Every structure is written in C-alpha cells, then in structure tokens.
Regions:
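Beta-strand-dominated extracellular/periplasmic modules and repeats
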Residues: 1-212
Length: 212
C-alpha cells in the first residue's frame, strides 16, 4: 500500500515542474465534535496533467498517494501539489456516448479520501476544489456543496517560513466527521464499490488516469 506517516506526509516527489505547492490539512472528529486520534486518512490525487501514479508511467510508484494517521488532536497534514481536472480522451467510446447525450466528459480538480477509525463508520469521499470550471459541472455527478473546498493562496512570509517552504502556496482545509458504529462490517471499506465509484473509475481508466 501507500507509504504511511504519523500526522504529516509529503505526497509528491517534487518532479512536476508545473505543480503549485498545496498544504492540505484538517481534523478528524466524531459526531460530537471530539477529535479522533490515530484516525487513518488515506489520500490520493492526480498530478498537474491529470495523471495518477500506477496508471501514468512517467510518475514514481505511490506518487501523490499517502496514508496519514491523525495526531493526538485528530489532525492530519500533507504537502503536495494542486491537482488538475481531467477528461475522457477525445473520440473514446465514453466520449462518443456522452456527446450523443449532449454531455461532456470533464472532471474538476479533486482529491480522494478513505477515512477510518476503530468504532467508527468507514468513509469514502472526495473534495472538489472551488474555482475549477467544472466544479459544479462534474460529468460523474460527484459534486456536493459541503465537499467544495477553496484553495486559499498564502503569500505571508511568516506562514511560508513556518512550513519551511520556498514561496507562496495554496492551503486546502478539509475536516472530516465520522459516525460511531459497533457494526464491524461498517468500519471497513465495502468490498464492492458503489455504482458511482464504478463510473468514475471507468472514466479515469479510459483517460489513462484511473484513481484506484
């Protein structure tokens, strides 16, 4: 699986010349607002050209894929780059079908999550970055208002120095709430992906950028 870290991880390998530095952070809490220390936060996203490691041969293995265990306050932090949106290839079967239906095959910039903790329901989700032309027009119908997150550009020298960065960066904050459950089968990812996940995977695979 993806490399694991406690509290903080760098996700990208630094090789993307067009990558804008992203500081991704948040807190995992229960429905009562209490932090969940040690929560397992699995994160993955594509590069600045819309490609995912494993499916893009130009990238290193596990590039922009990490598992971060939340710290004592339930917080996780990752340094990476802002992902790009992507679409199905022009003329591919899916593109032909979508156009026949009057639809496009574009997806906005987004970041995938699995979040889990003992005694809590496993969560599969993603966030769409605000400001992308397709944020509210995702062909996979994956946009939810509460999952649209801004990428705030930070230019304050003190904030840059605190993170030991070389220049301005985009900060993305996404807090997660997990519901409590005693049911063991709800504490792990379902073996069979939901139909919408299947559709997203198929579109990504056709684009050469599968998100698995």
């Amino acid at each position: 699986g993806a490399p694991e870290a406690e509290g903080f991880a760098r996700m990208d390998d630094g090789s993307d010349p067009d990558g804008e530095t992203m500081w991704l952070t948040g807190q995992v809490r229960d429905v009562n607002g209490q932090p969940i220390p040690g929560a397992k936060v699995e994160i993955w996203h594509c590069n600045s050209k819309g490609g995912y490691s494993f499916f893009d041969p130009s990238q290193d293995e596990y590039n922009m894929r990490r598992t971060i265990y939340a710290d004592s306050e339930g917080r996780y932090t990752a340094r990476s780059i802002i992902p790009s949106g992507y679409g199905v290839p022009e003329g591919a079967p899916t593109d032909v079908v979508l156009k026949s239906l009057g639809r496009h095959g574009e997806r906005p910039a987004h970041i995938h999550y699995f979040v889990s903790a003992p005694g809590h329901q496993h969560l599969t989700t993603q966030i769409n970055l605000a400001g992308d032309p397709y944020t509210y027009d995702d062909f996979a119908f994956a946009t939810r208002e509460e999952l649209v997150v801004p990428a705030e550009r930070i230019e304050d020298p003190a904030e840059i120095a605190k993170r030991e960065l070389d220049g301005p960066f985009a900060q993305v904050v996404f807090d997660v709430e997990l519901a409590q459950t005693d049911a063991a089968e709800l504490q792990v990812r379902h073996a069979r992906p939901r139909a919408k996940e299947d559709e997203q995977d198929l579109a990504s695979q056709l684009a050469g950028t599968a998100k698995v």
